[in-house]
C-alpha cells in the first residue's frame, strides 16, 4: 500500500496516490506544517518551535491555538488521503510532534539525497556506469527547486541546500561524460549547470574542453567569451589564469586532452590547480577590498574637512 504513495517536494508540492493527485490537503498552513515535518522528519519538532515558525507575527497564545487547529486538520487530511497507511500517522506528544520515518520511501527528497551521497566522495575516474545511472535518476527527480513558490526562511535555507546538491550532481555528470567521451550529453548537462550558475568558471572550462574535443573549436572559443562576460557581470572579475591558459591552448590548437585512464584516482596536479584558482580569486578580492577601504578613507577625510570648515564658519 505504501508503494502507491508519492510525495513531491522538489518543484511544486504534490501528493500522489497511484496515478491520481490527492487534493485532501487543502489549506496552505496544513501544507506548510506537513512539509516542515517531512523535511525535518529525523528529529521530533517542539510545538513551541512550530507555532513560532508558522505564525511568527502572532502572539504565543494565538499561534499555539492555530497549531492545534492546523494539526487536527492535518491528521484528518492524512486519514482521508489513505487511512490504511500507518506511515502517515503522526507521533504526537504534549511537547513535540514527529512524522513516522517509514515515510522515507515515499519522498522524492530522500531518494535524491541518497543518490547524492552515493557519489559525493568519488573522483571523476572512480564513477562507474551504475553511478552514472544513479546520478541521472537523481537529476530526473529534480523537477524544480524545493517547494517552488514558497518564501519562508526555513524553506529558503533547505532550498539552497538541495540546489547545491543538484549542481554538484550536474558537475559530476559532466565529468563522467568527459571521461567517457560522451561529449554531446556532457554539453547538455553543462548547459543546465550554467543556466543555474552562470558564473561557474569550472563549468565554463568543462564546456570549453567538451566543445573542443567534440571537434568544435569555434564554440570552445565562444564559450570562453561567455565565461568572461558572465564573470564580469556577475562577480566583477576576470577569468583565472587556469581558464586563460586553456583558452590560449585551444586558440593555438595545442590543447591535449588528459589521459584519464592512465591517471591515478587522486590527481594532485588538479588539486593544486584548483587551489591556485582559489588563491588567485582571494588575491583579487583582497585587492578590491583594499581599493574600497582607501576610497572610504578618502571620503571620510573629505567629510571631516568639510565638517571642520563648517565649524570654523
PLM-predicted stretches and their roles:
Residues 1-188, 226, 254-313:
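Intrinsically disordered, low-complexity protein-interaction/activation regions
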Residues 139, 212-236:
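TPR/TPR-like (Sel1-like) alpha-helical repeat modules
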Residues 155, 228-259:
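Hydrophobic positions within repeat-based interaction scaffolds
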Residues 192-193, 227:
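Canonical positions in the second alpha-helix
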Amino acid at each position: 500500500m505504501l508503494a502507491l504513495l508519492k510525495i513531491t517536494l522538489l518543484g511544486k508540492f504534490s501528493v500522489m496516490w497511484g496515478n491520481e493527485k490527492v487534493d485532501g490537503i487543502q489549506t496552505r498552513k496544513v501544507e506548510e506544517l506537513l512539509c516542515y515535518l517531512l523535511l525535518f522528519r529525523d528529529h521530533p519538532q517542539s510545538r513551541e518551535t512550530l507555532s513560532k515558525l508558522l505564525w511568527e507575527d502572532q502572539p504565543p497564545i494565538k499561534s499555539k491555538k492555530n497549531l492545534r487547529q492546523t494539526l487536527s486538520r492535518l491528521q484528518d487530511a492524512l486519514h482521508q488521503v489513505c487511512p490504511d497507511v500507518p506511515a502517515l500517522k503522526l507521533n504526537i506528544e504534549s511537547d513535540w510532534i514527529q512524522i513516522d520515518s517509514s515515510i522515507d520511501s515515499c519522498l522524492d527528497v530522500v531518494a535524491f539525497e541518497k543518490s547524492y551521497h552515493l557519489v559525493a566522495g568519488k573522483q571523476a575516474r572512480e564513477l562507474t556506469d551504475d553511478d552514472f545511472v544513479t546520478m541521472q535518476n537523481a537529476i530526473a527527480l529534480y523537477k524544480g527547486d524545493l517547494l517552488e513558490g514558497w518564501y519562508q526562511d526555513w524553506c529558503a535555507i533547505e532550498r539552497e541546500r538541495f540546489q547545491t546538491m543538484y549542481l554538484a550532481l550536474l558537475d559530476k555528470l559532466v565529468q563522467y561524460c568527459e571521461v567517457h567521451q560522451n561529449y554531446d550529453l556532457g554539453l547538455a548537462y553543462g548547459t543546465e549547470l550554467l543556466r543555474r550558475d552562470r558564473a561557474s568558471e569550472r563549468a565554463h572550462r568543462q564546456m570549453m574542453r567538451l566543445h573542443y574535443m567534440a571537434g568544435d573549436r569555434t564554440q570552445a572559443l565562444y564559450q570562453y567569451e561567455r565565461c568572461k562576460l558572465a564573470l564580469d557581470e556577475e562577480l566583477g572579475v576576470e577569468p583565472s589564469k587556469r581558464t586563460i591558459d586553456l583558452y590560449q591552448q585551444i586558440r593555438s590548437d595545442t590543447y591535449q586532452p588528459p589521459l584519464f585512464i592512465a591517471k591515478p584516482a587522486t590527481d594532485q596536479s588538479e588539486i593544486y590547480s584548483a587551489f591556485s584558482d582559489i588563491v588567485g580569486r582571494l588575491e583579487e578580492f583582497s585587492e578590491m577590498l583594499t581599493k574600497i577601504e582607501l576610497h572610504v578613507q578618502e571620503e571620510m577625510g573629505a567629510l571631516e574637512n568639510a565638517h571642520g570648515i563648517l565649524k570654523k564658519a
